[in-house]
Structures are given as C-alpha cells and as structure tokens.
C-alpha cells in the first residue's frame, strides 16, 4: 500500500516538475525581448494583459510567462535584483494555489511579487499576508517600486489605521497586511450597519508568507471581538486562594493534554472547603447545576497555577497579563485567554481582575483563509505538515530547490544530565566560536531561559544581544546584525523570522551606509566565512520538528557556510513530558558514565518523540475544525443575512408576519383546539395591541391574519420617510444580539459536550444536533423580535429610534 502511495506521490511530483520546467523555460525565453522594452512600453504591458483577460478571454495561465518576465525586468530596473530561476518556479507554484517551500534566504519576498502581479490583473485585489506590522510595512516599501513601475497600486494595512484609510488600502491592486488585521477587519465588517461602512472587498486571492506559522501554529487560537459580561472577579480571587492551599495529591496535572482534574478525595476536600466558606450550601454536591461556575473557576485557577509559567507563557507588564506566542516568543498585546483562564492568571499574579468577556464575533484562521477564492503560501518548513495542509486547506506542498547548494553542517545533538551541565557546554562552545569571530545565534524556548542564559554569558564576560518578547521593538535590527564577526545573539524560538541574517551583518540596517561602510561589510563577511559562517545553537528541542528546522534554517542561507547543533538535558520539557521511559532510562545509564551523549541514535529517538507530539497536535486541530465548521456554517448564514439586509432596496415584513403568526398559532393549539387565553397573551406580547376579540370570532386564523397585516401597514405609513432604514436597523440589531447569545451558548455547549462521550454518545454528532436546534430557535426568535420591535418603534429625531 505504502509503495503505491509513494508511486502516486512520485508520479505527481514528476508531473509538477515537468510543468515547472516548461513554465520556467517559457519565462526565460522572453527575457531578451522584454529587456528591450522602454519603461513606458513595459508599463503599458499591464494594460495589454488586462485587455487580453477581459476582451479576448485569455486566462491568467496563458499570460503568466510574459507577465513573470515583465516582473523580473521591473525588479532588475528598480531594485537591481533579478529573479533567479528557482524564484520564478516558486512564483509559478504560488499562482497554482499551492505552498512553495523554499530555503531561508532564497528571497521569498521577491517571489511573492510574481504571483501578486499576475493575479492583480483580474482587478479583484490580492492580499499578501505577513506575521507582523513591521514586515508588512517593510515589504510594501521595498516591493512597491516593482508594482508601480508596472502601473499597479500597492498599499499596506497596519494596526494603527482608521476605517477610511483601511477601505482605501483594500481598494489597491495589491495589499500587504498581517493575518490578524485581515481577520479582524472581516469580523468588524460583519458588525457594521451599512455596506458603505465596510472596508474589505471580496476575498479573492491570498499569498501567505510564513504559511506554517499562520495556518498551523495559530490555527487553534481564534480571533475574537468581545464585550464585557457580568463581573465574577471575586470568584477568581477566592478560587485562586483555595487552589493555592490545595494539596497537590488531590488533583492530577496532565502536561501532555494541559488539563487538571480533581481526584475523588479532591472533590470531597473541595466540597468541605466551599461549604466552610459558604460558597455552597451544606449537603450540596459540587457538581449540582448551581455550583458549576464555581467548579469552572476552580479548575481554571488550578490550570493557571500548575500549567502556565510566568516569563514562558506570559509576562506581567504595566499591571497586565501579556500572552507570549509559544511559537515565535512574541508578545500578543490585546489577546486574552477565554473561558476565565485570563482572570485566573490575573488572580494568580495578584493583579486587578478584569471582567470576563462575552464573544460578539469570532473566527479561526482556518476558516477565515478557507474563504479566499484562491490561497497559496510560502515557508522554509512545510514538508513535515504536508498532510495537514492538504487535508484542512486543500494545499499541496511543492519543495523548490535552493539557488545554491546548502553548505550548513548539522551536528548531532548533545545531551546532558542537567540544565546546568548543558549551559556549561553551550558557554564553552560560545567562547570557542567568539574567539575565532564566528557569529552565534542561540535559540531558546522561553523568555525565562533566554534571560538565564544571558546571565551566564555576562558572568563569562561575553558581550551579546537578547531578543525576546521584551525587546520586540528592536527585533529586526538585532536579528539583522546577528551575522557580524563574533556576534552572540540569544533569541526566543523564531523571533525575527522574515529578516535575513547576512554574514558580516546586514548593510541595509546601517544608517551611514557608504563606500567605506560597504568595504567594512565585505571585510566582515570574509572574516565570518573563514570562521565557518553563522553557528546556530538550539538549547532545547521544540515539540515540533518544524520549529527546530526553522531555527537551523537561519544559518547556511543562499549557499553560505554555517553550522548547527542542539544541546539537550533530561530536564527539557520534550524528554520529561513526551519521551518514553525506555529512552529516559537508557539516557540516565549512559549519562552516569559519561559527561554527555552525542550520537545520531539520540537525534532519531527525539525525532520519534516529536512525531508523536506533532501527530497528537494535528489530531487536536483536526478535531477542533470539525466543531468549528459547524459554527462556521452558521456564521456564513448570519453574515449572509446581514449583507442581504444591507443591500436590500425594499424589505417586506409580511412573509415574516405570516411565519410568526403560524408559529404562534401552532404553539397555542392543543389537539384540534386553540387555547384562546394563551393565544391572546402571545399575540399581545408580540404586536402590542389588544387581541381580546379572539374570544368572539370563529375564524381565528383569518382574524389574526387581517389584524396583524393592518397593524404593520399602519406602522409603515407612520414611518414612511425612513421606513427602509428603520427596518434594516431593527433586523440587524436584533440579529447581532441573538447571534452574540448563540455564540455564548455554543461556547458553553462545546465545553460540556465531551461529557457525552461518557454516555457512549459521539460528541461531534451531539454538538451538531444541539447547535442546529439552537440555530432554529435563533431564527424563530429573530422573526418574532423583528415584528415586536417594529410595532413599538418611535422616531425621536432623524436617525434616532426608540423602542417603546
């Protein structure tokens, strides 16, 4: 079976390689002819391509060779940079709607210009997605020279922009922006009251840089727009004190699944403590419905204390908990954990506890980016997640060869008995490299570890730079100069991705760049090359091989020399939490005889442990998206209804009246008879009119139909000037409120649904069933509330409504 799969895969690869080779040859064959064009003639090619697209029905595939040749020439004329053949191949893969895996330093920023230009010709907009504002600004400023030379408009969206600026930026042919800004703009647009207030166009085509970081690493973190709910801060403060007192034998901490659960003895002890503190009534059970909020707060407090580390998972800054991205080491300002976990952390750190937030709108990156008509991406490390990209996003990964052979030497891992011995070995290597002026990049997994290692380097009198979440503002500059002779740089995980570490330092960051500076740079580059290039040191294996490969990939760019090595200890999280007992016991025996173990077997064993973790994380993400897809389908319906209302030139309430009346009559029917008292009460509560005449009439259905239509007609005559706008405002406002409540229900449902597995029920099927029923109730309530609000509305002044 596996042989068959490999044959199919190899066959597919051969076909792609053939197509890439053919495409490249076509682009190269046009280079001389395009080079002979004047600047005006080159710019006019854009108009010519559009005419072929719109008037001659040509396809983008047919235009690709000439368009790519034009971009290559424009880049050479404006930036002095000619796209290499491998970059042309990468650009072709992007146009095909695939992921282009290219080694670090291969010029992915330049690759994106090819597919961005070609797809912008369709005049539907192209989004080039980066991981932070700095890269979005940098790439816009850098690449806009190419686009403008070809007559296209380019823009950039950053977090400090207002709506009018955003709307203008989205109208450009090509827009650079972060994944967060794009996602939040989509959510905010779908909370607006008119089309004119919305900023985004339809989602046509996206090129995602560092696609693995955005579509894999951040897939489990939804974008959430929230509002404040009732204050329960006192509960978190109380539960934190209680959790701190609780003996660790009364609960089980599972670091693999990041959960905490009370033992039976723990449940009994908690019940007694809560009764003593008068949080629950004497004789009451911990898991009775009225006590579930207490249980939830306590569980979150136990998680905050046992599973979340200060300076690793978060930092405290200006009296706030600021989350740290576990994959990049960057601070995530404005992000808060949901479900009370953030409040539990605030209680743990004795900070002011903020109110819990209620979700007003949310979406995962998985579902946001799947809305694009075409999606593609670039990264240096996608192959290990090939299956996930294919299964969830329908994206194929194509590995592009490097322009020059990779000369980096990847040494076997070294493993030590303790963290102390590991750091001593790292210091010894750092001194050795520093003496011969070989630059070093040391990757750590947390702020705490980076600062601890920094203290050790200071003791050894080794000058160095530290890049972690606390130095975020200097990220690009620190990383850019990490290739200078003798430089030592400590960086958390993959901070600084997107900025090249050039041997000798990056001259573009030298403000006083001149002939003298260029000579100095050339001299420094030669010194570093002779010393062996950049030496990357990993202080710990990450859960994902991909993150380790990203760190290694900082060295050996574009055929440069370089080295890499990982130093590990038995204290490391990967070995402690995920390593098998067999590996750990074998290592302990070996380490008792030697100072360190260095063998390819160790590297292979650790990679097996990493594969296990990757597989588990993939299953979690795959399972999460199954649940999120249910919510996403409902979100699409709600957002579509909002758009239809905003675009409507006329809204007829009579079909809604008919539906509401039919449902009200059905609810008041008992066997073949109406409960008239119930019916009168229901109709009066909806229509705000007297319906006592129902006692006297025989044609109940006819009377209700006639009277309700008369009420609506009278209200429409009273508000004729602003009638359409009143209807739109009412319908959208009520829909938003009900959707907000529905999201809260779904959040609670998802938290509790796993209990269904205990009763031998499939949690996903149960979730779908209950979510569907709740969505039907939302629709019924929406229609009823529309009518109830419309008949009660009074105009106080122009554009101001008051529901009586």
Swiss-Prot record:
One of its GO terms (molecular function) is protein-exporting ATPase activity. It is an enzyme of class 7 (translocase). One of its GO terms (biological process) is protein import. Monomer and homodimer. Part of the essential Sec protein translocation apparatus which comprises SecA, SecYEG and auxiliary proteins SecDF-YajC and YidC. It is a peripheral membrane protein. Keywords: ATP-binding, Cell inner membrane, Cell membrane, Cytoplasm, Membrane, Nucleotide-binding, Protein transport, Translocase, Translocation, Transport. It is found in: Cell inner membrane; Cytoplasm. Belongs to the SecA family. Part of the Sec protein translocase complex. Interacts with the SecYEG preprotein conducting channel. Has a central role in coupling the hydrolysis of ATP to the transfer of proteins into and across the cell membrane, serving both as a receptor for the preprotein-SecB complex and as an ATP-driven molecular motor driving the stepwise translocation of polypeptide chains across the membrane. Pfam families: P-loop_SecA, SecA_DEAD, SecA_PP_bind, SecA_SW. The gene is secA. It catalyses: ATP + H2O + cellular proteinSide 1 = ADP + phosphate + cellular proteinSide 2. Its EC number is 7.4.2.8. GO terms for cellular component: cell envelope Sec protein transport complex; cytosol; plasma membrane. This is Protein translocase subunit SecA. ATP binds at residues 87, 105-109, 500.
